Structures are given as structure tokens and as C-alpha cells.
Amino acid sequence: MNKKGIKISIIGSGFVGSTTAYALMMEGLASEIVIVDINKEKAKGEAMDLSHGVSFVKPVDIIAGDYEDTKDSDIVIITAGAGPKPGETRLDLINKNYEIFKGIVPEVVKYSPKSILLVVSNPVDILTYVTYKLSGFPQERVIGSGTVLDTSRFRYLLGEHFKIDVRNVHTYILGEHGDSEIAAWSLTNIAGISVEDYCKDICKGCEGNFKNRIPEEVKNAAYEVLERKGYTSYAIALAVRRIVEAIIRDEDSILTVSTLLRGEYGINDIYMGIPSVIGETGIKRVLEVKLSKDEEKQLKESAEVLKENLNKIPIK
């Protein structure tokens, strides 16, 4: 974005929203951060706590406010809504968060009609679709956090397994941010070497079942964190920061954000995590990467899961 000051508003000051504000502040990505929450005192407390540390980072104004204070935001990040409790899946939250979004999105659009909307609340793929419909924005300006975090978890676990720097592990998790997501093994490599060849020629210590075990660990990662600490915050905040960074710096980075499919992969009219080129206008391109036949089948099945659940709410 070719402008001096970047204004980012965060709707929701819970664990994810407040940690996201901290991550953005630490990276120096905004000149102004506005935090909005139904619990105004909580939002004020978060803004105060963050503001007390601004002497240690690049100059930034951090305030708690109402929707009118978000006016002319460049990016609006929506983290508000009910989070999953232990034993719940993300899809269990559909109806509760749909009702919450009906109150949020029109207010955001009213004050920032040219903004890019970044949805983080769960179930993120469905709520991104809801935001797209409620906002009337073009699809490239309505983005979900998608499987950006899942992909990071996958890379981390593969790096741990192969005892290699995670930055040299290249792969994607695609589809729903949830239980029907798929691991794109056909695209997975370590410094250009397929995991099969790496295992056979270099690692030579694999127990053989990692291709089943690791994707399950990725799927269950959030649930395990929930069981232990009651919520997730740090990793998702860093994932959101990465998406925002790609937008603000017009990086043309490829990230597995939740994007609207219009026939790609034989899938129509659903948001899901797909490799997409991200820059200052939002989603610049949706990439159709070559998947195995089985992965294509699983991706379509993931889309069907999302469509079945989307049909539970009266969105038009």
C-alpha cells in the first residue's frame, strides 16, 4: 500500500484479537490500530496495556473505540465471536457466530467501504463467505485466515520429524480450516527433495507411518492446545500478521488463505484454504496447483462438508 499511514481495525479484543494487535504492533505494520469490542472496558484495557509499550516499537497510535472510530481503515480484522470449548469443533459455532457477524459486518462496511476484510473467527471459511455476502465487497477484498496456520503447523511437525529447519520444508494444508482439511503430500518437499526420497536417502530413520500420523496431529493441534490452556492465540496471531504484512507490503506472496472458488478444482461458490497470491488489493490470483487424484477428491469432499454446513444458515 503506497501511503504513509496504515490504519488497521480489529473487531474483538479476546485472546486472538489482543494478541493480533500485539503482533502487528511489534512488526510495525500500522500507524494506527483501533480495537473494538462489545466489552468496552476490556478493549480499553488492552489498548492501554499495548500503548504503555509503544516507546519500544515504531510509532503507533492504539485506541479502543466504537465502529465510527474505525472510519477509513485500510484493513479490518474480525476476530469477534464465540470460540470452541473443549470437545467442540469449529463447525459447532456456526449459528452463534453468524448472528454476531450480522451485527458486525454492516457497521464495518458503513465506515470503511474501501477496506480489505480479514476474517479470523471460526468457522473461518463459512464466516468469510458470510462476510462476503453481507458486505457486498468484491471477493478479492474479503479474505479468511484459511489454512495459513494449519500449513505452518504442518511444516513445523515435518521439520521436527525430519530434524530440519522448518523454513526448508515446503508444503500446504488445503480445504477447510478444520477436520476435513487435507495435507498436500504431492506438493511436499524438503529443499526440492520429495519426502519419500528424503526419508529413503537421507533420513533413514522414519517409522513409516508419519504420512498418516502428522496430518492427524495438525488437525488435532488446536484441540490439544484448547485442552491445555483453554484457547489459542500466539500462532494464529502470527498467521494473521503474516497475511497483513503481505497485503501492506504488496508482496505477491502465496498463502493458503480462505478464498472464494469460482470453478477452480471443480469447486464453486465456497470459501476454503487455497494457495493464493496476496498483495495490496487483497487476493490477486487463486492458484490451481497440480494435486494427486486422491487429493483432488479429498478437496471436493472438504468443499461438500463446508457447503452442507453453510446450508444451515439463511445466508443469501
Curated annotation (Swiss-Prot):
Known partners and oligomeric status: Homotetramer.
GO BP term, pick one: glycolytic process
Activity regulation field: Allosterically activated by fructose 1,6-bisphosphate (FBP).
NCBIfam families: L-LDH-NAD, PRK00066.1, PRK06223.1
Domain of life the protein comes from: Bacteria
Binding-site positions, substrate: 90, 122-125, 150-153, 232
One GO molecular-function entry: L-lactate dehydrogenase activity
KW Cytoplasm (keyword) present: yes
Pathway connected to this protein: Fermentation; pyruvate fermentation to lactate; (S)-lactate from pyruvate: step 1/1
Gene that this sequence comes from: ldh
EC number: 1.1.1.27
Family annotation (InterPro entries): L-lactate/malate_DH, L-lactate_DH, L-lactate_DH_AS, Lactate/malate_DH_C, Lactate/malate_DH_N, Lactate_DH/Glyco_Ohase_4_C, NAD(P)-bd_dom_sf
Subcellular location: Cytoplasm
Known catalytic reactions: (S)-lactate + NAD(+) = pyruvate + NADH + H(+)
Residues at the active site: 177
Keyword S-adenosyl-L-methionine on entry: no
Keywords, ordered alphabetically: Allosteric enzyme, Cytoplasm, NAD, Oxidoreductase, Phosphoprotein
List of residues binding NAD(+): 16, 37, 42, 67, 81-82, 120-122, 145
Main localization, broad class: cytoplasm
Protein name per UniProt: L-lactate dehydrogenase
Modification Phosphotyrosine, positions: 223
Lineage summary: Bacteria, Bacillati, Bacillota, Clostridia, Eubacteriales
Family, similarity comment: Belongs to the LDH/MDH superfamily. LDH family.
